[in-house]
């Protein structure tokens, strides 16, 4: 993200669901001159343009055609250099019938002084290489998430009182290659903290983790 913002580059981040893409991107988006857009399957071209307008703070109510609104977005980025536009869940913008929404993003990048990061599940990379060569060959930066390491889990739980057995279970939930991911770790921790609050306790034990697990669909 930092490289794309600094050098006005185009980057892609891919990773499986639950590996922490959205969490990390939202954290970065707290920095100045960063606009974060989260996409979904129902978005039309006009919805994408409106989301970008809202993300960069353009006044509402201008209306106009998609072309004219995209031009205003380009003008904004050319006037306000140093911005990064993050498009999360970008794989949801592509289907077998149309790639128009990705072409809108390509047009903004080509004609604006702005860095763009698109992020999504692994099929995003496949779709770009197979069906959107004009987008793929513009990529300056690429990063593929590999999941959390043991040390990263320990760092994430820093500040909490966790016994050895509970720590081992939390590490497994985050790093297990079959079902482990950041989302499972985060959900487990949130439930653990709820239980601790109810009990008036502070120490995370294996018993508490088991109670938290009973509240979840695993």
Language-model features: locations:
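Short glycine-rich substrate-engagement loop in P-loop NTPases that contacts/grips substrate
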Residues: 40-80
């Amino acid at each position: 993200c930092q490289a794309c913002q600094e050098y006005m580059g185009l980057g892609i981040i891919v990773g499986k669901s639950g590996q922490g893409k959205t969490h990390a991107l939202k954290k970065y988006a707290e920095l100045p001159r960063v606009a974060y857009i989260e996409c979904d399957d129902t978005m039309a071209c006009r919805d994408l343009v409106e989301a970008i307008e809202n993300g960069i703070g353009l006044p509402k109510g201008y209306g106009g055609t998609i072309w004219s609104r995209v031009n205003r977005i380009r003008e904004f980025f050319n006037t306000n250099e140093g911005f990064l536009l993050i498009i999360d869940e970008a794989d949801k913008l592509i289907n077998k019938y149309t790639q128009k929404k990705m072409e809108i993003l390509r047009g903004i990048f080509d004609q604006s002084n702005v860095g763009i990061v698109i992020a999504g599940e692994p099929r995003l990379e496949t779709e770009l290489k197979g069906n959107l060569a004009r987008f793929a060959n513009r990529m300056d930066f690429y990063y593929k998430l590999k999941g959390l390491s043991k040390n990263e889990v320990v760092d994430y739980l820093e500040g909490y009182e966790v016994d050895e057995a509970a720590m081992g279970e939390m590490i497994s939930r985050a790093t297990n290659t079959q079902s482990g991911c950041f989302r499972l770790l985060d959900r487990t921790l949130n439930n653990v903290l709820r239980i601790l609050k109810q009990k008036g306790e502070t120490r995370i034990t294996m018993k508490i983790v088991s109670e938290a697990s009973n509240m979840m669909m695993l």
